C-alpha cells in the first residue's frame, strides 16, 4: 500500500512519486488549495490538493474529517520558502496529490482531540478508556519505542555476556512473599488454586540448581496491592541470576549493565563508579533506604543534646527508645513562614500524614535561636552552640525537628525533606544520582504481630554466619545483616537483589525465624528445600523494574505513561472494563460460589 513513511522523506525524494498512508491530522482550505497534515507513526507530511487536479479528487479532500484514514499517491515537491515549517523533519517538503483513497471514516465525534494543534489536557480516566486514541497522539508511541530500546539494549548486553533467556511459569504456587497473590482457580483440581507470580524468585534459583549458570528474563509479575504512581498490579521486571558469584561481582556487573542502557538510550556516559551507602547510613542521614542525594537537608541526630533539656516531648522520645532528629533549610526564615509549619499548614500536614504528631521548629537569628518558649527556656549557650554545630545551621536558616518513634521520625522528616526540596526547587532535574544501598538487616519486627519479617525476602543469605554455628544460629540470624543490595536513582528504587541461601538447613532456619512452622515450610517451600539438598551452587542475582527505569529515562511522573494498556489506581482496565463479572456456568464449572457482604 505504501512505499514510504512520512519522516523517511527528504530532499533527495523531490520529484519522486510516493505512496503514503496515515491519518488526517488537520485540513486547511487556503484560497482554493486544500492543505492536509498527514500523520503516521513516524511523524507528519503536508499534502496539497488543487482544484485543477480533478473535481472528484478535490471533493474527496473537501469532506475529509480529522482522523480519517487515507492513502495518497503523489509527487514530492519542495515547499515555497514562506511556508517552510521548521518544527517537523519534513518541513521543507510537501506532496502534490494525484490520487486519494479513503481507507476508513470515523463514525462518531472523538472523545478528545488527537492533533497536536488541538491538544488539550485530557483527564487521565478518559485517556485510559480510549487508550488506542491516546496512543495515536504520538507521545505514548515515542515512550513505547524508548521502552523497546531499553529492553533491546539489555538483551544485547546480557546475550553478549553469556546469559540465557528463560521463561518461567505464570501459573504457579501461592507462597508468602509480602503482597497478596492474584489467585487462579484450577478447574481440574477442585478447590485448589494457582497463583500468578509476584516474581520468578524461586524458579530462577532452581535454574541455578539445574546448572544454567547465567539466567535472565523480561518477566511479567503480579501483586495485588494498593497502587500509586509508580506501581501497577501487573508489571515488568528484568530478572537476573548467576551461579558461583560474589556480592561484589553482582554489583559490578549490573552497574555496567545500567551504564550501558543509559549510554545506548540517552547517550550519557558515567565514568565514575556509583557511590555506595549502607542501609544504616541511609536511614541515619536520609530517613529512608531510597535516598535522593541530589540535594542536601540531611537528617541530624539531636537526641543526645535535646533529650536532656527537660522538654517533656523530647524526654519521652528518648526514654522510650525513640529519636530526635532535624533537617536544616538554608535561608528558611525567608522562604518558609510559620503558618506552613504550624498545625493546619501544608508542611505540618506532610509530617502528620507520615505518622508524626507534629513538627517543632527553630529559627536561627544571629547567635540566637527563636522557638517556642518550652524549648527556648531550657536551652543554655552550650546547648545552642552544640545544636548549631550538629545541624550546620547559620543565620537565617530554619531547623525542623521530629521526635518520637524512630521509624516515624525518619519517615516524616524524609517526606518533609522531599516536599520542601520540590517546593523550593532545590532538585536539579537533569541530574542522575545513582546509589548502591548495601548491608540491609535480614529482618524487621512487625510490631502488630510481634514477629520478624524479612526486610527483602526470606531467601537472602545472611552475612558472616556459617552452619557450623548451629548452637547460636537462631540468635545470630535474627541480628544479622543480609548480602542484599538495592540500586537507587534520584530517590527511587531501580532494582534490588541479594546472594541467596544455598544450604537447606540455613533456609529452614530463616523461614522459622519469620514465623513458619516446619510443617508450613514443607508445605510451602518443600520443593525448594529438597532442591537445596541436592547440590545447589552459591548463587545470587537482582531484579530491576523495567517500567520504573523507562519512567525515569523519559522524565515521566507515572509508570502508566510507559505501559501500552495500564490499569488505573483502582487496578481496573477502563478500556475493557476488567475485572468484570463472569457467568454462573463458568463459576459452576469451578465449584465457586460468590457471596457479597451487605
Swiss-Prot record:
Keyword line: Aminoacyl-tRNA synthetase, ATP-binding, Cytoplasm, Ligase, Nucleotide-binding, Protein biosynthesis
Catalysed conversion reaction: tRNA(Asx) + L-aspartate + ATP = L-aspartyl-tRNA(Asx) + AMP + diphosphate
Enzyme class: ligase
UniProt subcellular location: Cytoplasm
Binding annotation for ATP: 223-225, 232, 493, 545-548
EC number: 6.1.1.23
Region (Aspartate): 201-204
Site entry (Important for tRNA non-discrimination), positions: 30
GO molecular function annotations of the record: aspartate-tRNA ligase activity; aspartate-tRNA(Asn) ligase activity; ATP binding; nucleic acid binding
Biological process terms in GO annotation: aspartyl-tRNA aminoacylation
InterPro entries in the cross-refs: Aa-tRNA-synt_II (IPR004364), aa-tRNA-synth_II (IPR006195), aa-tRNA-synth_II/BPL/LPL (IPR045864), Asp-tRNA-ligase_1 (IPR004524), Asp-tRNA-ligase_1_N (IPR047089), Asp/Asn-tRNA-synth_IIb (IPR002312), AspRS_core (IPR047090), GAD-like_sf (IPR004115)
Cleavable signal peptide: none
Alphabetical list of SUPFAM superfamilies matching this protein: Class II aaRS and biotin synthetases, GAD domain-like, Nucleic acid-binding proteins
Gene3D superfamilies named among the record's database cross-references: Bira Bifunctional Protein, Domain 2, GAD-like domain, Nucleic acid-binding proteins
Transmembrane domains' residue ranges: none
Superkingdom assignment: Bacteria
Residues the entry annotates as binding L-aspartate: 177, 223, 456, 500
Family to which the UniProt record says this protein belongs: Belongs to the class-II aminoacyl-tRNA synthetase family. Type 1 subfamily.
Function noted in UniProt: Aspartyl-tRNA synthetase with relaxed tRNA specificity since it is able to aspartylate not only its cognate tRNA(Asp) but also tRNA(Asn). Reaction proceeds in two steps: L-aspartate is first activated by ATP to form Asp-AMP and then transferred to the acceptor end of tRNA(Asp/Asn).
Assembly and oligomerization: Homodimer.
PANTHER family for the chain: ASPARTATE--TRNA LIGASE, MITOCHONDRIAL, ASPARTYL/LYSYL-TRNA SYNTHETASE
The name this protein goes by in its record: Aspartate--tRNA(Asp/Asn) ligase
Species: Prochlorococcus marinus subsp. pastoris (strain CCMP1986 / NIES-2087 / MED4)
Name of encoding gene: aspS
Amino acid at each position: 500500500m505504501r512505499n514510504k513513511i512520512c519522516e523517511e522523506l527528504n530532499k533527495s525524494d523531490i520529484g519522486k512519486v510516493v505512496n503514503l498512508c496515515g491519518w488526517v491530522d488537520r485540513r486547511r482550505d487556503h484560497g482554493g488549495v486544500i492543505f492536509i497534515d498527514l500523520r503516521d507513526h513516524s511523524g507528519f507530511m503536508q499534502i496539497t490538493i488543487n482544484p485543477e487536479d480533478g473535481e472528484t479528487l478535490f471533493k474527496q479532500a473537501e469532506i475529509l474529517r480529522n482522523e480519517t484514514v487515507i492513502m495518497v499517491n503523489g509527487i514530492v515537491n519542495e515547499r515555497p520558502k514562506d511556508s517552510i515549517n521548521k518544527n517537523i523533519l519534513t518541513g521543507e517538503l510537501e506532496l502534490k496529490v494525484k490520487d486519494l483513497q479513503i481507507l476508513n471514516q470515523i463514525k462518531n465525534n472523538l472523545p478528545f482531540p488527537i492533533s497536536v494543534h488541538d491538544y488539550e489536557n485530557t483527564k487521565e480516566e478518559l485517556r485510559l478508556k480510549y487508550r488506542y486514541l491516546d496512543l495515536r497522539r504520538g507521545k505514548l508511541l515515542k515512550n513505547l519505542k524508548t521502552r523497546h530500546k531499553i529492553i533491546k539494549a539489555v538483551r544485547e548486553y546480557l546475550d553478549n555476556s553469556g546469559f540465557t533467556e528463560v521463561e518461567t511459569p505464570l501459573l504457579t504456587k501461592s507462597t508468602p512473599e509480602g503482597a497478596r497473590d492474584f489467585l487462579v482457580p484450577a478447574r481440574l483440581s477442585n478447590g485448589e488454586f494457582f497463583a500468578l507470580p509476584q516474581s520468578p524468585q524461586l524458579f530462577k534459583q532452581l535454574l541455578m540448581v539445574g546448572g544454567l549458570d547465567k539466567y535472565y528474563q523480561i518477566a511479567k509479575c503480579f501483586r495485588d496491592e494498593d497502587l500509586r504512581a509508580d506501581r501497577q498490579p501487573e508489571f515488568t521486571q528484568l530478572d537476573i541470576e548467576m551461579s558461583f558469584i560474589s556480592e561484589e561481582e553482582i554489583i559490578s556487573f549490573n552497574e555496567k549493565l545500567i551504564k550501558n542502557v543509559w549510554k545506548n538510550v540517552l547517550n550519557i556516559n558515567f565514568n565514575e563508579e556509583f557511590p555506595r551507602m549502607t542501609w544504616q547510613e541511609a536511614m541515619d542521614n536520609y530517613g529512608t533506604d531510597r535516598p535522593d542525594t541530589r540535594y542536601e537537608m540531611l537528617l541530624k541526630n539531636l537526641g543526645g543534646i535535646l533529650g536532656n533539656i527537660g522538654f517533656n516531648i523530647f524526654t519521652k522520645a528518648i526514654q522510650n527508645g525513640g529519636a530526635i532528629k532535624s533537617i536544616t533549610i538554608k535561608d528558611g526564615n525567608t522562604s518558609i513562614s510559620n503558618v506552613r509549619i504550624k498545625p493546619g499548614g501544608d508542611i505540618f500536614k506532610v509530617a502528620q500524614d507520615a505518622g508524626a504528631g507534629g513538627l517543632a521548629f527553630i529559627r536561627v537569628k544571629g547567635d540566637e535561636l527563636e522557638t517556642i518558649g518550652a524549648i527556648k527556656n531550657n536551652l543554655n549557650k552550650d546547648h545552642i552552640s552544640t545544636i548549631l554545630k550538629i545541624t550546620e545551621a547559620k543565620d537565617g536558616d530554619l531547623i525542623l525537628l521530629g521526635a518520637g518513634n524512630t521509624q516515624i521520625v525518619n519517615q516524616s522528616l524524609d517526606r518533609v525533606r522531599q516536599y520542601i526540596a520540590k517546593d523550593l526547587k532545590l532538585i536539579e532535574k537533569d541530574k542522575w544520582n545513582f546509589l548502591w544501598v548495601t548491608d540491609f538487616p535480614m529482618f524487621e519486627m512487625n510490631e502488630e504481630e510481634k514477629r520478624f519479617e524479612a526486610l527483602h525476602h526470606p531467601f537472602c543469605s545472611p552475612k558472616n554466619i556459617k552452619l557450623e554455628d548451629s548452637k547460636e544460629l537462631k540468635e545470630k540470624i535474627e541480628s544479622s545483616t543480609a548480602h542484599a543490595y538495592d540500586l537507587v536513582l534520584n530517590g527511587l528504587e531501580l532494582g534490588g537483589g541479594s546472594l541467596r541461601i544455598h544450604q537447606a538447613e540455613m533456609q529452614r532456619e530463616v523461614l522459622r525465624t519469620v514465623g513458619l512452622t516446619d510443617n508450613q515450610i514443607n508445605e510451602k517451600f518443600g520443593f525448594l528445600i529438597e532442591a537445596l539438598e541436592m547440590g545447589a551452587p552459591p548463587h545470587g542475582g537482582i531484579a530491576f523494574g523495567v517500567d520504573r527505569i523507562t519512567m525515569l529515562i523519559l522524565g515521566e511522573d507515572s509508570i502508566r505513561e510507559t505501559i501500552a494498556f495500564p490499569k488505573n489506581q483502582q487496578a481496573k482496565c477502563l478500556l475493557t472494563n476488567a475485572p468484570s463479572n463472569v457467568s454462573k456456568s463458568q463459576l459452576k464449572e469451578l465449584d465457586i460460589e460468590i457471596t457479597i457482604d451487605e
